[in-house]
Every structure is written in structure tokens, then in C-alpha cells.
């Protein structure tokens, strides 16, 4: 279903209107207000997914342009939409009300619960098992690479899982024990009104376990600094501003937590001949006034394998006329029909004429007829009428 429809707002809605609509629906369908109601839980995840996209300017722009699948369907799409579990939906919920999962939040929930540090089972704290940070890199492609698609190797700096302890943070399996306070759950639960709040266990920082004999290689963190090569397959048809998400290619998490994601932002270099407008290509083709008058067939460049195609320019063509060559444009990133090549004709007036050339043009001018220049005749007729209106 369309995200705007899910939130009940128009496509022209302001960010404030989108946020207001989401807050109203999120409170209505929150699982703590609807215990055991599977449909309410589904709707809560659904509105959270919609807000995750429409509440972010960049994601919203991509959604408006390409739809729900995004330009990189199968590679992450909007990078965050798709509430597969309640934790993601609750994180979106808290963010919309000004909450912060690290215990530094304010706004609505802090006022409601009195300094809420952790809520609804969200894991936070300054220590313990935390998901690895996401990484962001920019990659510049040539115009041809964007058209054909390309494979690239990127060198990414960050953290990888510690090989010595397999990411556990402990020297041996005996160097870890279950947390006595939370009994391994990583959370301590409190009830206030109809809300049940699960805050991070202060003894194990939400990990559910305590490392008694830390790994000497990573000092109990479960990860170490690293540089690695990442192979990226970029599809044909990409454009500047598009984003590719590679799940799990960011920093490794601490103490066995999931890795973050890698976001690759695309920049495409301009082309010396073509301009891109969506999936269409625009080519400015200068021709002489004789060719424009008599018509001509010309070989013009394309991005296809053949490299050129023949264009039939009809006689009497005017400067600014656009001729369309179907299917010779840019490939569509979704695999749909290729765009068209739009050839804009530019009739060039000759310069630096010889005396002989000037004489030939004068002779041609003497043979001119009104039907040779319909625009000129139309203009003269108009100004005759204009001056006659002011005749005394």
C-alpha cells in the first residue's frame, strides 16, 4: 500500500503534517494499548514503516521518484524501511516523540515517564552489545559506467569482528557468565499504567551476560580496527544522488552484536556531448543553414554498442526543433524500457564569408519568395497591423 495512504496524508503534506499523522496512529495502535491484538501490531509496524520513509527528506524524495522498491530493489531500497520486528518499529516510535535510546532523550516520553532511559525493550547504554555503526562512502562513475553498469572494489576502513574470540569478547567460553540481575534477558521490566517498560540492565548493559575473562586481542570489545575491500555491483541506469545499501557491510558490532550497514552514494560525471533528463538523453546538434534548408542524413553518436545511428533531418527544419530517436537513451535502473535520444537542432549562421559567398547569398536573396519564410511573412503581417493601428 502507498505510504501516504497508510498515514492518511496527501502527497503534498508538510513534514509537520506527516509527523502529526504518524504520532496519532502510532499511539492508537501501540502494542501496549492493544495487548494480544495481532492486527494492531501489524498496523503499528505498517505506520512506522511509512513514517520511516516519509519522515526522512532524502528517503521521501527517493520514494516519490521511484516508488516503494527504490532504485536499488534487492539491495536495501530505502535502507531502514520494512519493519520486520517490533524493535525497529518502537525505535521509530520513540524517535518521532523526541526519545533517545541512549538515555539522553527528552520531549514527550521523558515528560510522561519521568526521565525514561530505556523503553519498550530498546537496547542502549554506553557499553554492552551494540550494533556496529553504519558507514557512508561516495563513489564517482563516468557517464558510460552509469549507463552500462560496473563492478567496483572499495577500500573501507572500520571495525571487523575479532578473529581471536569470534566476536564474543571473551578469551574462552568459560570467561562469560549469565548476568545475575536480569538472568540473561538483558532487561529489567517496570510497569507504569498501561505501559510496560523494559529498561537496559545496568549490570550487564543489556548484554545478558558478563565477561569475566576478556579477550586480550580486542580487550573484551569483540571487534578490532580493520581495512577491507568490498566488491560492489552497480546496476546500469544509476544517477547522481542514488544510494546503494549493503546490509552488514558496516562496522562489526560489539560483543557479537550485528554489524552496521554500508551506504554507497552515487555521483555521475557529466558527459561532453549528452545531457541526461531522467532516462532520456539530449544531444545538441549544430548544422549549417544549407543542410537545414535542403535536409540531410547524419551519423550521430549514441551510448549503444554500435556507437552511432543515422538521423534523417528533413528539409526546412528550424533551429530548436527536437527530433526523437526512440530507444537510444539511458537504460532504466528498474529494467524497464530504455529512454529516448532527443536531438535538438541548432542551425548555425555562417561567419567569415568570402566575397564570392556573399555574392551568391545576395543572388539567392533576390529570388526569395514569401512562402520560403513563413515566419518572416507572419511577423511582417503582424507589425503592419500594429503600425496601422497608430496611423494618424
UniProtKB/Swiss-Prot annotation:
Transmembrane segments: none annotated. It comes from the Bacteria. InterPro entries: DnaJ (IPR012724), DnaJ_C (IPR002939), DnaJ_domain (IPR001623), DnaJ_domain_CS (IPR018253), HSP40/DnaJ_pept-bd (IPR008971), HSP_DnaJ_Cys-rich_dom (IPR001305), HSP_DnaJ_Cys-rich_dom_sf (IPR036410), J_dom_sf (IPR036869). Residues 2-67 form the J domain. CXXCXGXG motif repeats lie at residues 162-169, 179-186, 201-208, 215-222. It is found in: Cytoplasm. One of its GO terms (cellular component) is cytoplasm. The keyword Chaperone applies. The J domain is necessary and sufficient to stimulate DnaK ATPase activity. Zinc center 1 plays an important role in the autonomous, DnaK-independent chaperone activity of DnaJ. Zinc center 2 is essential for interaction with DnaK and for DnaJ activity. Homodimer. Participates actively in the response to hyperosmotic and heat shock by preventing the aggregation of stress-denatured proteins and by disaggregating proteins, also in an autonomous, DnaK-independent fashion. Unfolded proteins bind initially to DnaJ; upon interaction with the DnaJ-bound protein, DnaK hydrolyzes its bound ATP, resulting in the formation of a stable complex. GrpE releases ADP from DnaK; ATP binding to DnaK triggers the release of the substrate protein, thus completing the reaction cycle. This is Chaperone protein DnaJ. It comes from Chlamydia muridarum (strain MoPn / Nigg). The lineage of its organism: Bacteria, Pseudomonadati, Chlamydiota, Chlamydiia, Chlamydiales. The gene is dnaJ.
Amino acid at each position: 500500500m502507498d505510504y501516504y495512504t497508510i498515514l492518511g496524508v496527501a502527497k503534498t503534506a508538510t513534514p509537520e503534517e506527516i509527523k502529526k499523522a504518524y504520532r496519532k496512529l502510532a499511539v492508537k495502535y501501540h502494542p501496549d494499548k492493544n495487548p494480544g491484538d495481532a492486527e494492531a501490531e501489524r498496523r503499528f509496524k505498517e505506520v512506522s514503516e511509512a513514517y520511516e520513509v516519509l519522515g526522512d527528506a532524502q528517503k521521501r524524495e527517493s520514494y516519490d521518484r521511484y516508488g516503494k522498491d527504490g532504485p536499488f530493489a534487492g539491495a536495501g531500497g530505502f535502507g531502514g524501511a520494512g519493519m520486520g520486528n517490533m524493535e525497529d518499529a518502537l525505535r521509530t516510535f520513540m524517535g518521532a516523540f523526541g526519545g533517545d535510546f541512549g538515555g539522553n532523550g527528552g520531549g514527550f516520553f521523558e515528560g510522561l515517564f519521568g526521565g525514561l532511559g530505556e523503553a519498550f525493550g530498546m537496547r542502549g547504554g554506553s557499553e554492552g552489545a551494540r550494533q556496529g555503526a553504519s558507514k557512508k562512502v561516495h563513489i564517482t562513475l563516468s557517464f558510460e559506467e552509469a549507463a552500462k553498469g560496473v563492478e567496483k572494489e572499495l577500500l573501507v576502513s572500520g571495525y571487523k569482528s575479532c578473529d581471536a574470540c569470534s566476536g564474543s569478547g571473551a578469551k574462552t567460553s568459560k570467561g562469560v557468565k549469565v548476568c545475575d540481575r536480569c538472568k540473561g534477558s538483558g532487561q529489567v521490566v517496570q510497569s507504569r499504567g498501561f505501559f510496560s517498560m523494559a529498561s537496559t540492565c545496568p549490570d550487564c548493559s543489556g548484554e545478558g551476560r558478563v565477561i569475566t575473562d576478556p579477550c586480550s586481542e580486542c580487550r573484551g570489545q569483540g571487534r578490532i580496527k580493520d581495512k577491507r575491500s568490498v566488491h560492489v555491483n552497480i546496476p546500469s541506469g544509476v544517477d547522481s544522488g542514488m544510494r546503494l545499501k549493503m546490509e552488514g557491510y558496516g562496522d562489526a558490532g560489539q560483543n557479537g552484536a550485528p554489524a552496521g550497514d554500508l551506504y554507497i552514494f552515487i555521483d555521475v560525471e557529466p558527459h561532453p556531448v549528452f545531457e541526461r533528463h531522467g532516462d532520456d538523453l539530449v544531444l545538441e546538434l549544430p548544422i549549417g543553414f544549407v543542410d537545414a534548408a535542403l535536409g540531410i542524413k547524419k551519423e550521430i553518436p549514441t551510448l549503444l554498442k554500435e556507437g552511432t545511428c543515422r538521423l534523417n533531418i528533413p528539409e526546412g527544419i528550424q533551429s530548436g526543433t527536437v527530433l526523437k530517436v526512440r530507444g537510444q537513451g539511458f537504460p532504466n535502473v528498474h529494467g524497464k524500457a530504455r529512454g529516448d535520444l532527443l536531438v535538438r537542432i541548432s542551425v548555425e549562421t555562417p561567419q567569415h564569408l568570402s566575397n564570392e559567398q556573399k555574392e551568391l547569398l545576395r543572388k539567392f536573396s533576390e529570388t526569395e519568395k514569401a512562402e520560403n519564410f513563413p515566419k518572416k511573412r507572419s511577423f511582417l503581417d503582424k507589425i503592419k497591423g500594429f503600425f496601422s493601428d497608430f496611423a494618424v
